[in-house]
UniProtKB/Swiss-Prot annotation:
Its main location: cytoplasm. The lineage of its organism: Bacteria, Bacillati, Bacillota, Bacilli, Bacillales. It is found in: Cytoplasm. CDD domains: DltA. This is D-alanine--D-alanyl carrier protein ligase.
Amino acid sequence: MADLINILNHFVQEQPEAVAVRHTNDELTYKQLDEESSKLAHLLQDSKKPMILYGHMSPYMIVGMIGAIKSGCGYVPIDTSVPKERVNMIIDKVQPEIIFNTSDETLEQTNAQVLKVSDIQDSQYPIVFDSQMKQNDVVYTIFTSGSTGEPKGVQIEYASLNEFAEWMVSLNKTGTGKEWLNQAPFSFDLSVMAIYPCLTSGGTLNLVDKDMIKKPKLLNEMLVQTPMNVWVSTPSFIEMCLLLPNLNEQQYSSLKQFFFCGEILPHKTAKALVERFPNSMIYNTYGPTEATVAVTSIQITEEILNQYNPLPVGVARPGTKLFATEEGELVIEGQSVSLGYLKNEEKTTAVFNFEDGVRTYHTGDKAKIEDGLWFIQGRIDFQIKLNGYRMELEEIETQLRQSKHVREAVVVPVYKNGKVIHLIGAVVPTEPVEDNLAMTTHIKHELKSRLPEYMIPRKFEWMEQLPLTSNGKLDRKKIAEVVNG
């Protein structure tokens, strides 16, 4: 099996002065990335616990990742946007010996040794380190939200990461030495889709920070300054960027490939993108954190757009098997599946199975296969009951998005005494709404031809933009707070 450190070493030899990572004017070459990560690996080599990697979009976050891989201890990435209470819960769960803090923020009381960027830069350790990471070692642990409020640490094996990076490089048709855009913070595993495929193809990883996400104008400046070739983001992020009228092939002719993951890619968004970038390759992918980022892919073409709505997530990647249970729940089997949740046997045994050396994960996603392609139909636990009727909120959202008056939509249940009493549609219209009542009546009339009466939202809230989480996904919690007043 491929080993990403060996591949990285190849590019260090071949193109030492090429830029490996860039954030605004802060850059590290392949040589610098190799040397700085080797110095860090020397500091980490006696650590028996994963290293906590704290920060935002500093290139030294990548130094931290590569250094932790070389040392064999692995890493736990935490973005500065993560609330302090949650950071403390993660530190408490991991019990790290070393924290590499690349930010200016001070972490609260911890018994771990805290390293700063200057400690690595000033270190006199040798700039060479032979990687100690074995294929069956845990390379990273990413914490996802738990239903009880306690975050769950998803442990990913080095072999799984290598297999994933190799697959992604095979999907990337732009070639080696390209400019990659990464939107996701490092505590969100979508970032893995950009980091390792980029570095194992000799590319430059360009980091989008939270200010650029808040102000697309800053992102536009970055795109003008550095023409990108490969784009990796959530669908919600590209949806926001499509508000920039000049985000098109004429303006950005170098942008040849898009990868989307993390949430459902709406048909309308994909269609708008295909119209603006007719000669680019647009990939829709699907996968939970528990199965190493993504396990399916499909190139979205005019033909696919004309044939399917909602869009498929494609076919399983090599080495991964997918099947649906009688209830329609998608189960993933293969090397991509995580080793389970860190120090949480109860949660692990509930959704993972490791019998006979075969790893499976029950996703909680509803899925079907049609024409040899997989379709994700929302969360099994995203069903609600209204007046005795069981329904999928995402199905209503899909139908809402069909309207030419709707650019984006989210459906929010309104609860009273723990029971759903009605639904509200939060809608971003394609044009400003002059008469709310008339537009609501019109949309309801449209929905009547596609949905039963009980699934139609009682009222609609018209919004300029739907809020996003720090990961660049739709912030359903915030939307619910806004519409519920």
